[in-house]
Amino acid sequence: MKKLVNILGFKISWWACVVGPSIDMPYIGPAAMLIFLLAHFSFNGMESSEIKLVIIFSILGTVIDTLMALSGLLTYNGTYSNEIVVAPLWITAMWCGFALLVNHSMAWLEGKFFQALILGAVIGPIAYKAGEGLGAISFHGNMLHVTMMLSIVWGLSLPLIYWVNDRLKQR
């Protein structure tokens, strides 16, 4: 039951994060994700390694998505301003929520580097394509290049989050 609540809470918050920018309400998603975070920690307890994982990947994920935006292959709606190219708050919120899946609904992937790499390389581009379809992001240039970038980024990011999680749990 906890795993189901975990994935449903993330999915609802993910939708709010992606739809919010397309309806000119970019902060509704981060608010929904904050509610998910608070509910998660009140339901599951405040484990320090999980809190650290959320903080690390909120920062790292924002940097990763900012670098992808700087590549010129994608732009985000609901940004802070047109002059500043930093991944928007709703992206940071999604990274926070995604980190909460690692020890719960996606715990089955722990210790499975190759499976995490393949899953990330496939699911990452699909999730971003869904975001484009809902108006949260726009792709520019050759779609093969965009897909390759997203596959590489997520093929590396998913195993990385499990590796970091493992190190945090060992402390």
Q: Which residues does each PLM region occupy?
A:
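Aromatic-rich, lipid-facing transmembrane alpha helices and their immediate juxtamembrane interface loops
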Residues: 1-171
